[in-house]
Amino acid sequence: MRLFFVIIVTSFSISCGNNSLLKEVKQLDYPSASGIEYFNRQYYIIGDDANDLLVLDSNFNPIDSIQLYSFTEKRIPKAVKADLEAITITKDNKLLLIGSGSLSPYRNIAWLIDPVTKQKDSIRLDTFYQRLTLYGIKELNIEGACAIPGSIILCNRGSKGYPKNQLILTSENFWKDQANVPISTILTGSATDSTVFNGISGLAYANKSDRLIVTVSTEDTRNNMDDGAIGKSYLWIIKNITSKKNWKTLNPDQVIDLEAIDPKFKGQKIESVCITKETKNFLYLVLVADNDNGSSSIFKMITEKK
């Protein structure tokens, strides 16, 4: 079992005009956090070039890890990494980890993991990813996933060279019948400035209010492979998402500029979000950031529903 140290950077509470509150920030000695999920009061974090799935308790303390790969390097080389970017909980309480698909065959992979028994199975997604190119996705770069009633939503991140974010809707167990499962896509967010592109990086679903929570980051890259200079990060909130599954395009109902909440978000490339609690008026969120230097950060925040 491998454990990873957590370095506490700061813990504070401030209020701001947009009714969001940053509660806590911690730095993780874990490479390239790209996805986070919350289940049974534990956090499960994947890194796009990490050998292990990291497990934290409810206070962000490392308590376990699940080995997926056995490279000697702390960070798997870019040319062969699986680029696991998305994580979600399936309807039968399994963790589904999904590779980006941006470099075949290495990144056309998924893992299905039982968080209780730690049983894990690897899944090839070649057939499913080949089909996605028939649905108008020019450059494949799967960055997030979440389960909604009756479906799974994936997000494909665009770039300055391919400025299109797309939500992909498919069946709950899409990997079991990849040649035949239904697929539909929704162009999400409008690109109005050619000098910057806001790329979707993660998804979470608030089931009580039927909201899709989307993490978005800006990065100066013109393709689906390379990293670039890190810009600002945002949360997009899309209301009534289950009633919009057949839409062809949609824009967020609410945009939250994270750097405007607190300067601790400056220079942080937010990669993913999970929901720990939802009340009538508030969403309790935890986000992770990958800073492209082999370290990661985790943020706890509250945002008011609007």
Role assignments for model-derived ranges:
Residues 1-23:
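Bacterial Sec-dependent N-terminal signal peptides
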